[in-house]
């Protein structure tokens, strides 16, 4: 074997060994939780993000708040849904909520992330006006990135224009 082939093969082997030891940037750590860590609370584990904020919760407890196209205003027919969440949180001081804003696929990614944020802030403001402690409320906008309903129809778009309540134990 000539010297150039040997050097090339050796260099390739060393590079492969070095790269195989690198961590996947999407894994978030050796636990594979993508930047999420856990805190034990009794028998439950509260998943938190890199900022220590809750990253998950129970989404099945309350109805979603739906929004009109290109709107972040809470419509009067949706207020009773927010009031139900406020009543629950005001009566359960050990609970908190993550408000998750979703949009349909129309519009740019940046616009939809901002619209999802405006939607959750509208819901947040209403919850606070009903006496919910702002420290019990976290917000997250998915924009169009995490559709609740797949499809390219008016029905699918309508279902994706919403705020989801994810309840967690503090």
Model-derived segments and spans:
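Short, low-complexity, Pro/Ser/Thr/Gly-rich segments in the mature regions of secreted, periplasmic
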Residues: 158, 163-170
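Bacterial N-terminal signal peptides that target proteins for export
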Residues: 1-10
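Short proline/glycine-enriched turn/loop segments at secondary-structure junctions
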Residues: 151-156
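Structural preference for long, well-ordered alpha-helical segments within the folded cores
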Residues: 81, 122-129
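C-terminal motif of bacterial Sec signal peptides marking the signal peptidase cleavage site
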Residues: 17-21
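Periplasmic peptidoglycan-binding/tethering modules of Gram-negative envelope proteins
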Residues: 23-96, 170
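Short acidic capping loops at alpha-helix termini that bridge into adjacent secondary structure
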Residues: 134-138, 160
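Short, surface-exposed beta-strand segments enriched in small/polar/acidic residues
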Residues: 63-64, 82-119, 137-149
């Amino acid at each position: 074997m000539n010297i150039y082939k040997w050097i090339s093969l050796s260099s390739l082997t060393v590079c492969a060994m070095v790269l195989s030891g690198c961590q996947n940037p999407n894994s978030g750590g050796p636990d594979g939780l993508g930047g999420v860590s856990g805190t034990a609370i009794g028998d439950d584990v509260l998943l938190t993000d890199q900022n220590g904020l809750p990253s998950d919760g129970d989404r099945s407890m309350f109805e979603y708040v739906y929004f009109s196209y290109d709107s972040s205003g809470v419509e009067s027919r949706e207020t009773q849904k927010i009031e139900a969440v406020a009543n629950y949180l005001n009566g359960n001081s050990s609970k908190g909520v993550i408000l998750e804003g979703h949009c349909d696929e129309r519009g740019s990614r940046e616009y939809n992330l901002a619209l999802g944020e405006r939607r959750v802030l509208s819901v947040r403001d209403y919850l606070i006006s009903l006496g919910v402690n702002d420290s019990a409320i976290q917000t997250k906008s998915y924009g169009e990135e995490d559709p609740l309903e797949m499809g390219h129809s008016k029905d699918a778009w309508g279902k994706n224009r919403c705020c989801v309540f994810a309840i967690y134990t503090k």
